[in-house]
């Protein structure tokens, strides 16, 4: 599994990384385990000499760009609000006049997140998080004319997704009351104790009166609501929801309507696959949504469907589309505008709700976002004026606004930040007649007369993709003098739903061969040193790293972050086993063979590749025992191995000191083994070990 948050921040080229919050920590708390010993966490992190290694010097020299969490255009298209670096202010910029930005301060030094405009474009609501051990937030409203702001409500628990009602009298939010941690399977899990599942925290829709601040929980207490959208008349919501554990049951969520007064739920649809982004049509008679095989909430990709609110059969508007829809909004009675991953690029298109005709509006060699997460834009009521956060491998994030495709840059937050790495190309190759796409980052000082090592980066997911986003981690690898290939093998987004479905019941099969074919294709085209290959990934990428080691000895070194070594034991260890059934076709108890044949642990005696293993000790998505199993197995078979456990970290390694340590150890591991003598680690051709 991935990743972002809403899926994973595990690797910066994946679609699911930018939402990850960086939290302050006074010390680096890590445990380092090597092939023969364990040592004190703090001592392990301290440098042994006063001089920096080359890897450390290169990583520390990388440009520091400011991040942008969200950009939202007002419904009238005249103003844009955004949040940068989770700071305690919001900036408003007039799109048409280009006026200087204004700030809305939050008293008490609180961090602001998740903006929402009022329908009349006169107010902005946002969430401010209190500095407390367990989630506690405040809901604020600011008047954009006078910039006066006031606190509307105190909220105990995890709150997200504020949205004004069509008449602006209410603000709806998603609230998990008294939740002891942030929501989602990516954050550090609460250590287990006592009776399991004695308390299940459900995420409910709550409304807050904009005058009195009165809070009312509306949706049923036994349902976990993942997403919602106001009906045009304000009387109901379209929601995706499921009973039971919210972390686990997103993969079996159904489509409902919820009465905004009584909370009565009515089922509209039981989808065949996962469902995301439900949106009412302008007349309130239909609901559009995205459905496809998805491995993580928030990492959205699939086709666009429409279903009557009254129920009935859903229509696929985009069957056979060679792209993955990621977000949508109705722009007319029979027109839907959507964003997409199209061949690894960001795209914007429209589809007719009547005929299903798709029209490409824009696409580019860059990453577009509006919420700091996936491919998405913020769209005004006219269906054309928009705000976006634009970034690419060579350009750091900035806020842009204007007509789609004719945006004007509004911010200069990173105007002095320049890429310190080589160029990047959108590359293609074939395997077994299947076209595969990826991104190739060149060494900084590229010279066609020389050969350079190559690192393969495998994204999380598997339903995700490498995207052309700003990444200092990959930039550092380029600055070290290495190629970086981030492949999008079968199972990824960007080539259509049929392509994403192609690794179902085939983990480690066609996807692995696609990656290896990519290495050979790059070596034919560019001066790749095939005696110095590396592989690295986190989550599903960590699994693929472990799997690759059992299938070939071509790699000189490997780094497996939050990897899965044994699918059978993993099924009983993780908090999200529902995700596995769509991908493996059955539970592990009904078809253990399909899990066993894709488990690296069953072929561990083939491994010769020196391996670095990294994991958070409170990872609920890919629990640390999976990494312990791999570490123990590699020690037993005599493979050089180091194992790092980050304390109080979840699936995402998010604390700044730990994130730096993660990236530094990764670079240093490849540097060490790329420099090793050929007699220490011979490369060889691939061998077959799978039944």
What do these predicted ranges mean?
Residues 405, 411-531, 536-539, 569-582:
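Cap/lid segment of the alpha/beta-hydrolase catalytic domain
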Residues 60-88:
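Beta-strand-rich domains and repeat architectures in extracellular enzymes and scaffolds
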């Amino acid at each position: 599994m991935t990743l972002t948050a809403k899926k994973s921040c595990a690797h910066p080229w994946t679609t699911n990384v930018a939402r990850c919050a960086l939290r302050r920590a006074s010390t680096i708390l890590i445990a380092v385990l090597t092939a023969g010993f364990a040592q004190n966490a703090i001592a392990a992190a301290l440098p042994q000499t006063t001089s920096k290694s080359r890897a450390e010097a290169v990583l520390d020299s990388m440009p520091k760009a400011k991040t942008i969490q969200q950009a939202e255009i007002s419904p009238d298209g005249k103003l844009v609000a955004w949040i940068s670096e989770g700071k305690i202010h919001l900036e408003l910029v007039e799109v048409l006049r280009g006026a200087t930005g204004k700030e809305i301060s939050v008293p008490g030094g609180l961090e602001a997140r998740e903006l929402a405009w009022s329908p009349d474009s006169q107010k902005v609501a946002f969430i401010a998080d209190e500095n407390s051990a367990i989630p506690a937030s405040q809901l604020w409203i600011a008047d954009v004319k006078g910039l006066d702001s006031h606190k509307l409500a105190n909220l105990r628990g995890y709150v997200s997704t504020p949205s004004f009602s069509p008449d602006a009298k209410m603000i709806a939010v998603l609230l998990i009351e008294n939740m002891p941690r942030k929501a989602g399977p990516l954050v550090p899990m609460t250590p287990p104790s006592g009776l399991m599942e004695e308390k299940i925290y459900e995420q409910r829709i709550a409304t807050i009166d904009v005058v009195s601040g009165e809070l009312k929980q509306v949706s049923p207490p036994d349902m976990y609501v993942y997403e919602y959208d106001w009906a045009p008349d304000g009387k109901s919501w379209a929601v995706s929801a499921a009973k039971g554990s919210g972390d686990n049951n997103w993969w079996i969520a159904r489509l409902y309507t919820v009465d905004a007064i009584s909370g009565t739920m009515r089922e509209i649809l039981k989808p065949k696959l996962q469902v995301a982004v439900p949106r009412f049509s302008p007349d309130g008679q239909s609901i559009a949504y995205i459905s496809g095989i998805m491995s993580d909430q928030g990492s959205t990709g699939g086709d666009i469907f429409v279903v009557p609110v009254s129920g009935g059969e859903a229509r696929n508007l985009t069957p056979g589309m060679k792209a993955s829809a990621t977000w949508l909004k109705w722009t007319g009675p029979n027109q839907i505008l959507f964003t997409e991953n199209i061949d690894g690029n960001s795209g914007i298109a429209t589809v007719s709700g009547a005929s299903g005709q798709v029209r490409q509006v824009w696409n580019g060699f860059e990453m577009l976002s509006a919420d700091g997460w996936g491919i998405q834009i913020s769209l005004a009521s006219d269906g054309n004026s928009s705000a976006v956060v634009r970034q690419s491998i060579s350009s750091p994030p900035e806020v842009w606004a204007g007509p789609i495709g004719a945006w004007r840059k509004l911010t200069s937050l990173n105007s002095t930040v320049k890429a310190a790495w080589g160029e990047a190309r959108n590359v293609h190759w074939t395997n077994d007649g299947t076209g595969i796409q990826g991104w190739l980052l060149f060494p900084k000082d590229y010279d066609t007369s020389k050969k350079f090592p190559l690192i393969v980066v495998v994204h999380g997911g598997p339903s995700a993709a490498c995207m052309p986003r700003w990444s200092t981690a990959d930039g550092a690898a380029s600055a070290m003098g290495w190629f970086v290939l981030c492949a999008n093998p079968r199972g990824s987004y960007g080539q259509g739903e049929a392509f994403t479905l192609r690794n179902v019941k085939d983990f480690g099969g066609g996807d692995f061969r696609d990656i290896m074919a990519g290495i050979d294709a790059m070596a034919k085209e560019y001066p790749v040193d095939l005696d110095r290959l590396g592989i690295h990934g986190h989550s599903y990428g960590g699994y693929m790293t472990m799997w690759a080691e059992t299938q070939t000895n071509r790699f000189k070194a490997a780094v497996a972050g939050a990897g899965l070594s044994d699918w059978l034991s993993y099924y009983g260890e993780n908090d999200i086993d529902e995700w596995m059934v769509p991908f493996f076709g059955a539970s592990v108890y009904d078809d253990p063979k399909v899990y066993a044949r894709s488990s690296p642990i069953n072929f561990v005696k083939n491994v010769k590749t020196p391996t670095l293993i990294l994991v958070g000790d409170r990872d609920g998505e890919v629990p640390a025992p999976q990494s312990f199993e791999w570490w123990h197995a590699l020690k037993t078979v005599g493979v050089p191995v180091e194992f790092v456990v980050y304390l109080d970290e979840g699936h995402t390694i998010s604390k700044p000191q730990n994130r730096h340590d993660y990236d530094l150890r990764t670079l240093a591991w490849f540097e060490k083994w790329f420099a090793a003598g050929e007699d220490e680690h011979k490369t060889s051709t691939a061998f077959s070990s799978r039944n």
